């Protein structure tokens, strides 16, 4: 087998930027930032969502108000809701 074709697999700390939760895991992702975790220094990878903040794992649903195509059309052309007038 050829040598030095695979990236280095090493322990890194992932930081959930939403909740501040940190966890140690193995990864090949490189980072210039480091952090002290449990007495050791590890590379730091920032993530927007993890098991600590994902709705599937937390049981909290995050609802966003997304207008449908019809609502956007009516808003764009200034049409009122026909059902609201009745």
Curated annotation (Swiss-Prot):
Keywords: Ribonucleoprotein, Ribosomal protein. One of its GO terms (cellular component) is ribosome. GO terms for molecular function: structural constituent of ribosome. PROSITE patterns: RIBOSOMAL_L31. It holds the Pfam family Ribosomal_L31. The keyword Protein biosynthesis does not apply. GO terms for biological process: translation. Gene3D superfamilies: Ribosomal protein L31. It comes from the Bacteria. Disulfide bonds: none annotated. Belongs to the bacterial ribosomal protein bL31 family. Type B subfamily. HAMAP family: Ribosomal_bL31_2 (MF_00502). Part of the 50S ribosomal subunit. This is Large ribosomal subunit protein bL31B. It comes from Streptococcus pyogenes serotype M1. The lineage of its organism: Bacteria, Bacillati, Bacillota, Bacilli, Lactobacillales. The gene is rpmE2.
């Amino acid at each position: 087998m050829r040598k030095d074709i695979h990236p280095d697999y090493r322990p890194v700390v992932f930081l959930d930027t939403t909740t501040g939760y940190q966890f140690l895991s193995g990864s090949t992702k490189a980072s210039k930032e480091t952090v002290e975790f449990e007495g050791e220094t590890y590379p730091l990878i920032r993530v927007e969502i993890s098991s600590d903040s994902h709705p599937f794992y937390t049981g909290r649903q995050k609802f966003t108000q997304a207008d449908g195509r019809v609502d956007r059309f009516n808003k764009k052309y200034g049409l009122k809701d026909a059902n609201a007038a009745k």
